[in-house]
Amino acid sequence: MQRVTLSLDDDLMAEIDAIIRAGNYQNRSEVIRDLARAGLQSMAQAPSPSACCVAALFYVYDHESRELSKRLTRTFHDHHDLSLASLHVHLDHGSCLEVSLLKGAGGEVTRFAERVIAERGVRHGKLVVVPGDEGVAPPHPHSHD
């Protein structure tokens, strides 16, 4: 770990100190490390097409939209190797929130998410990607039985 010196304006430091007072962090270094990681991740381009990643796909959709539920189910079944789990929440009479956890090659995960988000009736879609490292192996199509 390296030690660095930063110059920050008073307003920015006040916001960082407020985060610490809220009880989420022990010190400024922890806050700034997390902010730096988040900033680097948000500035990064799409995940490497071949590198493994994990991701969360969030989207809101109109469950009364014609055949949408069937199309989404078919899309997920066609790409079952990417899908780890899904959470379904009814927001109101007509809207549902789906959170799907995905794992696979960055290009495949991105294309899959774009396909889901592009479906007519899907709103507010967002993909959050975490690049893989040694602990994130690509899925493999055989069982361990």
UniProtKB/Swiss-Prot annotation:
Task: Give me the comment on cofactor binding.
Answer: Binds 1 nickel ion per subunit.
A GO BP annotation: response to nickel cation
Q: Which InterPro entries match?
A: Acetolactate_synth/TF_NikR_C (IPR027271), ACT-like_dom_sf (IPR045865), Arc_rbn_hlx_hlx (IPR013321), CopG (IPR002145), CopG/NikR_regulator (IPR050192), Ni_resp_reg_NikR (IPR022988), Nickel_NikR_proteobac (IPR014160), Ribbon_hlx_hlx (IPR010985)
Q: Which SUPFAM superfamilies does the record match to this protein?
A: ACT-like (SSF55021), Ribbon-helix-helix (SSF47598)
User: Which co-factors does it depend on?
Assistant: Ni(2+)
Protein keywords: DNA-binding, Metal-binding, Nickel, Repressor, Transcription, Transcription regulation
Residues bound to Ni(2+):
77, 88, 90, 96
Q: Can you name one GO molecular function term for this protein?
A: sequence-specific DNA binding
> Sorted alphabetically, which Pfam families does this protein's record hold?
NikR_C, RHH_1
Physiological role = Transcriptional repressor of the nikABCDE operon. Is active in the presence of excessive concentrations of intracellular nickel.
Q: How does it assemble?
A: Homotetramer.
Family label: Belongs to the transcriptional regulatory CopG/NikR family.
Q: What is this protein called?
A: Nickel-responsive regulator
What gene does this protein come from?
nikR
